[in-house]
Amino acid sequence: DFVKFYNEHIGTSCDGEGVGLKFEDEYGALTLCNGIVKTEDGTISCTIDIRVPVTLKAAEVRAMCADRLEDENGRIEVGEIGDPLFFPKESPLVNALYKAYVDVTGDTENEPMVIGGGTYAKSLKNIIAFGPEKLGMDYHIHSADEFILVSEMEEAVLVYMEAIRNLLAI
């Protein structure tokens, strides 16, 4: 039945192992999470959301799991998978943004980081998703009671202003 199929392939794991997608590179691990489960004409189906590590492409991910997403007990549909958005640390864009961060905050300890989240920046060319996050602070991102301190928001505005100046100079 579908529940057995789902539990064998997805279950409570978010690492993609059940569909042959367990993969990690130096920037992070692939994540695979349940999307929408629905019943239509007596058939249960679900979608999955996959966030792809930097060194994989969407087509490779589809090929890796194609034969493991359907059997007599169910079918899992893969929604749109976007190729990762990535710029190396040496990129002029990354350098301009990081310099703005350091100049405003004085923080030279924390470096630019790569995350696996989705972003509208993927819709444009030569764009980087960029935002404030203090390491060690739990902002409850995408959860109940998500927040940012007013002082950190004010600092972020100054970083964004400096970042715009730096980007205009490229």
Predicted segments, located by residue:
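An extended, acidic, His-containing surface patch that forms the Zn2+-binding/catalytic region
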Residues: 1-33, 38, 55, 75-170
